[in-house]
Amino acid sequence: MSQAETTKLPYKVKDISLADYGRKEIELAENEMPGLMALRSKYGAEKPLKGARIAGCLHMTIQTAVLIETLVELGAEVTWSSCNIFSTQDHAAAAIAAAGIPVYAWKGMTEEEFDWCIEQTLDFPSGEKLNMILDDGGDLTAMVHDRFPELLDNIYGISEETTAGVHRLEVLNKSGKLRVPSINVNDSATKSKFDNLYGCRESLADGVKRATDVMLAGKVAVVCGYGDVGKGCAHSLKSYGCRVLVTEIDPINALQAAMEGFEVTTMEEACKEGRLYVTTTGNKDIILGEHMKQMPNDAILCNIGHFDTEIDIAWAEQQVADGKATVSEIKPSDIGAVDRFTFNDTGRSIIILAKGRLVNLGCATGHPSFVMSSSFTNQVLAQMELYQNRDNDKYGVQVYLLPKELDEEVARLHLEAIGVKLTKLTQEQADYIGVPVEGPYKPNHYRY
């Protein structure tokens, strides 16, 4: 696949020789991503994204490769970087580079390399700049607003994948600094109620087990936060036989957790008995040094929120620098990043996974392809919606949700693949409840 007449395009990946391996896995993933493949079939001929120059900053995985090639199939030019220093699958990046698409990503980047990679995506092989942003976590959006504001007048839209990035968009919007129409993909029902919940339900345990080979059954696990991600994590660990404790600030979420049978307590109490800790909040300072010092020997700490601010890794590293602890690298970052910190005064150790970054991507391969198809179909539709309305006033400078009918369409595209047969309303039934026969069926405020 080539996206321009020039066949040799710049890229930076770890090992281009992995391209064949990556291509085989991409072909397998396509069979598990019916939403994206349906968009290719439906829109491939008309090229609705022709002229779009999409800079993407999202985990460079096999599933993302299918997203990238869908955008190209629909007419876009694409450049890509990863939104996390540990999340790239190097064979996926190699396959995309070999396909002639500029990609700048490898597993185990430094923070400086991470910023450099994002910056490379602003320029396209034609010599032109980006005119669309597809973001996950808001780093690309922030870079353009903070460092390259001169580019903003020519950017038609931003689509944002995750909770943390949406929060950053909302902060920009409320402060009057947002300058580009934006779509919050995260809060589409077919993203947050599937990726965040069912994706984490499978990929959390995958990351923990690949990193540690630990048996989960019988252990006390602490899940910090009971939003969609926390729900998926708590139910996953419960299904493995863990006794799950939940910490939560929101009384509604706390009540939900309690009604599901989880013990809801504070970190000050939970830190004394948990053998596994999972942060899911997207906030900062969830697990502090004072908590780590009280944990049982070889307690495992990991994070599945977007940023590395939830576990106070800096405190643990400072303990080592001050001679109060030692650290042993069990696995290097290119195969999972597992570090064991031992405190001199107690002799007890804690094990930190992926250096406090996303454990499911740092220590494993992230969510399964099928659930990512749902998320990424939303992304493609958001890019199409923004780009195709670039010359009218449908979208002003604020943060929008995808229209409900598109949210429902994403779900429809995935039903046949798993054998779902949908009941159809009669006109009389539709009239009775006041909805169209073909939907949308729920108001925007419906929570699912």
Curated annotation (Swiss-Prot):
The protein's role, per its UniProt record: May play a key role in the regulation of the intracellular concentration of adenosylhomocysteine.
GO cellular component, one term: cytosol
Binding locations of substrate: T61, D136, E161, K191, D195
Enzyme class per UniProt: hydrolase
Top-level taxon: Bacteria
Protein name, per record: Adenosylhomocysteinase
GO molecular function: adenosylhomocysteinase activity
Pathway of action: Amino-acid biosynthesis; L-homocysteine biosynthesis; L-homocysteine from S-adenosyl-L-homocysteine: step 1/1
The organism of origin for this protein: Rhodopirellula baltica (strain DSM 10527 / NCIMB 13988 / SH1)
Family: Belongs to the adenosylhomocysteinase family.
EC identifiers of the protein: 3.13.2.1
